């Protein structure tokens, strides 16, 4: 569906105006189901969207079904350990195949006609396909009817998909960020990140559109009023805007290193000694929120559930194997709790914005010419995705 059928193109073009003249995306993009599906197909679908975490598939032969904005998908770790993503539907009559996450002992079996698939998606069994007790038929080629794969890739434990299949490679999209962060992480920092087997994760359900979570994360403008404890040491004036390519966010000169009972977490060995209190918080469009500090990093996947509902999935990463030892357990828990407080403080704001999107007295709003630069940048990026898709329609 071309977007001209849903909304005047002029409305999106107005988002692209200079910030002092621009207005934001209109309310329908936050409240209406057809626009939610448009986001799925044209904004998230034409880019690399995160749908889960590889370590949530703890063993080989493990499958995890998930719903991606109405599409039933299946994240699958095969018997050799490779993670792949497929449409979670039988190629025969379209029945949803897998209902619950877990280990597959033999084959994936369709509950309708008992067709079976291996853990690489190949169709292996077709009972009575050629008639009673005729389980093969020369008129039916099993190799043409396996599960339908999606283009997928993994970075920083996150599983990404590209629905359209034609986005540039994930590493190409990420290159501007990874190059930027070499100044902090060095060339080995990503390889040093470690996740706890248990712990170091949380999920928060918020009653807002996924885009509002991105917008809130991108800017520090709300800090003094929404995050009073954080503002005691990392004040508004200690922050700077970050805007480039598929990224927008904020940096801080005053992150407070984790210190619990005198225990400091291990830090990235390449992190500059004179910048230990620097931190950067960047959204990788469309639905990933990232943070790096000298002693840990985090990734948050935004799971769009409905026009007015999103689940935020956070994962923490610490530096090296030593950081996961019992000696640092209290420090790791303290980091988790501090982020739990910060993200909980944001809930009222993003849910308040969602409620406001139902008002005829608001339809996109205005931007601060200085403080809202990252937010406006995200609006422009989203508007361009939609305008580009309309041109291709």
What are these regions (language model features)?
Residues 12-27, 193:
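Short, contiguous pre-domain boundary segments
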Residues 44-48, 95, 222:
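Generic structural signal for secondary-structure transition and capping sites
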Residues 45-58, 131-136, 282-286:
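Short Pro/Gly-enriched beta-strand edge/turn motifs at strand-loop
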Residues 56-164, 171-176:
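Rieske [2Fe-2S] iron-sulfur-binding domain
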